[in-house]
Amino acid sequence: MSSAPAPGPAPASLTLWDEEDFQGRRCRLLSDCANVCERGGLPRVRSVKVENGVWVAFEYPDFQGQQFILEKGDYPRWSAWSGSSSHNSNQLLSFRPVLCANHNDSRVTLFEGDNFQGCKFDLVDDYPSLPSMGWASKDVGSLKVSSGAWVAYQYPGYRGYQYVLERDRHSGEFCTYGELGTQAHTGQLQSIRRVQH
């Protein structure tokens, strides 16, 4: 007598609307979308519902601009995804699922200098304030994601610009802060958390 294999995670999916509060035209995504205006026919995205998986949204087409982590749940307007970010975006134009968001096995190493040089700090848990946990600098020069997926923030308390860090992108290696995203103009990272799957 054989038992059925355990079901894997449901495929990533989210629904987008061109107006706040889940109104107007909508489009459902199951995979990467470099430009929702072209692929989904929406002029803009003003509300989002994540049904499965974890997604990263970008304010511009082709995965450019500010990044916003979208975990399972409802985002009825821009303030729901911008949160306490110092940069508010009232539109999202490209989306992709986050890879390897395994909350049970997450590990990242921060380095003071570029190319994995200088003092290092190994993390396996959420840190709302890196300085209060012993990280002496407000900047991170480089980092390696050994497992899982993380969101790093510019300021303590999970505020400011967001940077989604995945083991399966860049082989988990970010040699300089410029590799964190197109909006990364400084290496200032002061809080970090594991992606909630």
Swiss-Prot record:
Q: Which residues form the Beta/gamma crystallin 'Greek key' domain?
A: 12-52, 53-99, 106-147, 148-196
Q: Name one GO molecular function term.
A: identical protein binding
Q: Does the keyword Repeat apply?
A: yes
One Pfam family assigned to this protein is Crystall
Presence of the UniProt keyword Repeat in the record: yes
| InterPro entries, alphabetized | Beta/Gamma-Crystallin, Beta/gamma_crystallin, G_crystallin-like
UniProtKB keywords: Cataract, Disease variant, Eye lens protein, Repeat
Q: Mind listing the GO biological process terms from this record?
A: lens development in camera-type eye; visual perception
Residue numbers spanned by region Connecting peptide:
100-105
Top-level division of the source organism's lineage: Eukaryota
For this protein, the record's PROSITE patterns field holds: CRYSTALLIN_BETA_GAMMA
Q: Where is this region: N-terminal arm?
A: 1-11
**Role summary:** Crystallins are the dominant structural components of the vertebrate eye lens.
Q: Which family does it belong to?
A: Belongs to the beta/gamma-crystallin family.
**Assembly:** Homo/heterodimer, or complexes of higher-order. The structure of beta-crystallin oligomers seems to be stabilized through interactions between the N-terminal arms.
**Domain observations:** Has a two-domain beta-structure, folded into four very similar Greek key motifs.
According to the entry, the disease involved is:
Cataract 42: An opacification of the crystalline lens of the eye that frequently results in visual impairment or blindness. Opacities vary in morphology, are often confined to a portion of the lens, and may be static or progressive. In general, the more posteriorly located and dense an opacity, the greater the impact on visual function.
The name under which this protein is listed is Beta-crystallin A2
**What species was this sequence derived from?**
Homo sapiens (Human)
Q: By which gene is this protein encoded?
A: CRYBA2
